Amino acid sequence: MRKAYTLYLLMALLAAVVMACVRKPKPTTTPWGTEVADVDDNSSERVTDHGSSDGITSLQQIMSNGEMIVLTISGPDTYYDYHGRGMGVQYLMCELFARRMGVTLRVEQCKDTTEMISKLNKGYGDIIAVQLEKRKYGDKKLRFCGAYEKKNGSNGIATQWAVNEKNKELASELDKWFKPTFPKLTLDYEDRLLAMAVTHSANWQPSGKAFAASRAEYDLLFQRYAPLAGLPWQLISAQCAQESGYDAGARSWAGACGLMQLMPSTAARFGLSREEIFNPEKNIEVACRLMGSLMREFSDVPHPEERISFALAAYNAGSGHVRDAMALAGKYGGNPHFWSSVEEYILRLGEPQYYQDEVVRHGFMRGRETYGYVRAIRRRY
């Protein structure tokens, strides 16, 4: 009975996620339904009273601070950024635990396991939300707790999250919270979110009179604001078709809003409030200003037509991932200033050999969507 009730509660939390394309503004939510305020790019520099004289932040201090710091590495199972939202099964489970404790979650992304353990023991983080091999790291002043796996059956390799060996109360709470069903439920949930995003992208292939009428409704706005981007208005229109299908009320599960699917934090950087983000004219204006900023950011790409593809990719996935793909292209004999070379590494950033490469700074990426995004817009335009 208790197991069934636990599963019911977990599924209730999963069902609370914001679904794609609702028609009115709602509070931004995490994938678990937790309402959060959008933060600016400097949020990772937020200062809290984190740590004690022995370098350990107790459970009581975490609750008092209202923040838990998770140490992780980039990867499809651990943590990655997807349209401004944290994803990865280990991260999503940790987010669920933080919600249960009533605190926010801050991510500290590390390069490798050595860095994670070092930061944990120095008090720079509270939990390592990565499956660490107990046999290999059992002598590193760690207390294994929380989410665990056992590979290859009962005689296989045991792995688990970890906290500092002195943090007994936090370890106890993690052990009481975790249920063996959580990883599978979380993976299924993440798969549904990703499938929803892919379906959304694939379905934006409208045609016919109704679609033409929707497009024509905004043509004057595209013409008015495209000069802010230094781009043809027809390109901005094609981008809008890909982003929302000309649906001014569209909102994605990740919180992207309006015709040009602006994230509230991005809109705020350009002075656009939450209350105005669905306004078609202001949404288009900010998107054009953002595209203009990205075109300038990639001014090292000498050919203007090539630069457009880089700016579009950055609009979709963020400049960091695009720069990583450029670095990989340069390292492996491609031309980092030609999109035909770089798009290959946009795709390869989903492979460990490449997202763990020393030249990569922003880790794992689901690049197929960005690859298709640029191609679809260029094809329409």
Where are these regions (language model features)?
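Bacterial signal peptide processing site
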Residues: 22-25
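Extracytoplasmic small-molecule ligand-binding "clamshell" domains
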Residues: 27-131, 174
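Ligand-binding clefts/hinges and TM-proximal coupling segments of bilobed small-molecule sensing domains
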Residues: 44-46, 176-213, 381
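A ligand-binding cleft/hinge motif common to bilobed small-molecule-binding domains
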Residues: 114, 118-121, 128-143, 323-324, ...
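A bilobed periplasmic-binding-protein/Venus flytrap-type ligand-binding module shared by bacterial periplasmic
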Residues: 155-171
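Catalytic and substrate-binding regions of cell-wall glycan-acting enzymes that process beta-1,4-linked
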Residues: 163, 306-380
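Export/targeting segments at the very N-terminus of extracytoplasmic proteins
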Residues: 197-246, 281-284, 299-302
